[in-house]
């Protein structure tokens, strides 16, 4: 245990918080769990806090980014996939309870991915749930600023990119006289427009020409 343990203990133990609302200050409350926010060590400690969550999964493949968790489960039979996901979601619920964390059901959703023909043949509704509480089904979702749809066509993502860059184009047309040189225009383009096209393009640049129509 030694010095590192004492150092972390002094950092985490006996932390208190108060709320100030409408000119009134609450009593001091001692924090018994969790990681302090607004600190340099906070994000690292939070990752360590969540680090063993995948150990409770039996079938799904987790992808974790801070407090966002994506589960992927693949298979040929929809009922087998449902059973595997529901079992792992129940395991996650137990893990969160044991670690004094709460799942935000308003941000919890699921999406089926496959060919258009296979998705059309899926039973409706698909029953994915946590503790008998149904999870909302979506047909496109945002993951790390990438819009993903069930057919992986990337049409929705490209549509968002087009709208953003159209806004930039009209803004530039209105204010282009403020750019005193061609280099200024180039730097603005690289920073505002091309950065959108470059972001994660290894994921979505396999889309067909029709996606840009």
Regions found by a protein language model. Give the residues of each.
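Conserved pre-catalytic core of RNA-dependent polymerases
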Residues: 1-35
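Short, conserved micro-motifs composed of acidic
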Residues: 23-25, 87, 102-140
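Catalytic palm subdomain of template-directed nucleic-acid polymerases
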Residues: 58, 69-97, 206
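Charged boundary/loop elements
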Residues: 200-212
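Short, conserved phosphate/pyrophosphate- and ester-handling motifs at nucleotide-, phospho-/glycolipid
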Residues: 38, 42
